[in-house]
Amino acid sequence: MATPNEVSALFLIKKYLLDELSPLPTTATTNRWMNDFTSFDQTGFEFSEFETKPEIIDLVTPKPEIFDFDVKSEIPSESNDSFTFQSNPPRVTVQSNRKPPLKIAPPNRTKWIQFATGNPKPELPVPVVAAEEKRHYRGVRMRPWGKFAAEIRDPTRRGTRVWLGTFETAIEAARAYDKEAFRLRGSKAILNFPLEVDKWNPRAEDGRGLYNKRKRDGEEEEVTVVEKVLKTEESYDVSGGENVESGLTAIDDWDLTEFLSMPLLSPLSPHPPFGYPQLTVV
């Protein structure tokens, strides 16, 4: 059961709350409130009634007959202003195991080159001399004035230098060195152009020339010998082996050098030389 002090305290709280909602109360409402308060003090309460008939006091909802203005529309707004809850759902971050996508740049656009143009630019020739100058050949030296000299060491003269000449290009000087090296050392020589040996092999050419010369000389000697024999036979037949003058004329026709080179004949030879009669041996 509530005591009078508790009832008065509740009433003051109700007054405080409801008066705050109406900042400009009317005089009629204040008079009614005062009359109710005085009647509440005069009548009093019996504590036995509170025990038998308990009542529930609504402090939030005011009575419509006491207040002229509408409070229902303002109380929810006040409650809404005083009690506001913000519900922010937690963010769930899910880390995926997928790799980031690769960034592949598209290929460049194909450019077509037009070869047939109106004014084609003349192409400059590639200098070949520069490449030849950079290469070093065996036995070749470059002179300060731009020409090339070829030299070789002669093994038969204790390695003395043999001058081969001065050439316009390094290739010509290298070929001159190769020819001389092959002539001195043969197949043991180290050459700049070993594949060109067959073109300028001096020994092969000299051997062929000597063989041909000897062959021609042998044919000429055979012809001369046949002619000499025929001449001697004719002279012998005409003279009959007794005319000395015919033999002398035949000797005059021969060359003196050929006569001296002939071999000596024996007296026992069946052929009488130079028209003399054959000697008989007893």
Swiss-Prot record:
Domain of life: Eukaryota
Any Gene Ontology biological process: cell division
DNA-binding residue intervals: 136-194
Disordered: annotated segments: 77-100
Gene Ontology cellular component terms for the protein in this record: nucleus
Biased composition (Polar residues): 77-98
Functional description taken from the UniProt entry: Probably acts as a transcriptional activator. Binds to the GCC-box pathogenesis-related promoter element. May be involved in the regulation of gene expression by stress factors and by components of stress signal transduction pathways.
Matches recorded under PANTHER family: DNA-BINDING DOMAIN (PTHR31190), ETHYLENE-RESPONSIVE TRANSCRIPTION FACTOR ERF105 (PTHR31190:SF499)
Protein name: Ethylene-responsive transcription factor 6
PROSITE patterns, A to Z: AP2_ERF
Family designation: Belongs to the AP2/ERF transcription factor family. ERF subfamily.
